[in-house]
């Protein structure tokens, strides 16, 4: 098992397990630290979605730093086993929802929520272009936008060699952060006034 750690918060320095092999590519400790340094002002009390969660390291970091609730979506073994092991090892028994049927099933569940989502993190296999476009287009759609809070962030981890689109529906690309082989693309819902022409325009 590959060992990682929680960076900060309630579970700071606690070890996390990840399976060996090429099928699972956990978000590195360094990239996770950078991500949460950026998210710091909004993590406490937030509602956080960790899609393609793998070992759960990102969502667990959010819990450790005070997120109100985290939704994990992962259906691939042995990553799912590691995710469950990590939650059990840290004795995290509430404040999360685990969807083990995958991202599609999780998006269906999220569509029924009355509580808006503040942060969405997605980390599909880097080569899975359809997973990136499908998930980002969902959150950029009318249905997906409806479950996001007004100032929500949607963040995609991807290869630093890849370039995601500047826009997916109402989601606008606002920031690109590269770190080694990995990159983070940040998206926000376009302001309402930007999604329609001013009165009088044809």
Give the location of each predicted region.
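Class I S-adenosyl-L-methionine-dependent methyltransferase catalytic core
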Residues: 1-202
């Amino acid at each position: 098992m590959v060992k990682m750690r929680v960076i900060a918060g309630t579970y700071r320095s606690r070890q996390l397990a990840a399976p060996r092999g090429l099928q699972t590519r956990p978000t590195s400790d360094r990239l996770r630290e950078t991500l949460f340094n950026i998210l710091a002002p909004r993590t406490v009390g937030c509602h956080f979605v960790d899609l393609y969660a793998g070992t759960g390291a990102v969502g667990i970091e959010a819990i450790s730093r005070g997120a109100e609730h985290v939704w994990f979506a992962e259906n691939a073994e042995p990553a799912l086993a590691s995710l469950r092991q990590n939650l059990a090892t840290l004795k995290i028994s509430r404040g999360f929802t685990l969807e083990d049927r995958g991202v599609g099933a999780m998006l269906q569940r999220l569509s029924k929520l009355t509580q808006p989502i503040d942060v969405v993190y997605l980390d599909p296999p880097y080569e899975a272009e359809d997973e990136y476009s499908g998930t980002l287009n969902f959150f950029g759609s009318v249905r997906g936008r409806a479950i996001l809070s007004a100032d929500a962030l949607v963040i995609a981890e991807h290869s630093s060699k890849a370039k995601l689109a500047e826009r997916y529906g109402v989601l606008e690309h606002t920031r690109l952060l590269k770190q080694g082989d990995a990159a983070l693309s940040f998206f926000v819902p376009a302001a309402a006034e930007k999604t329609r022409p001013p009165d009088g325009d044809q």
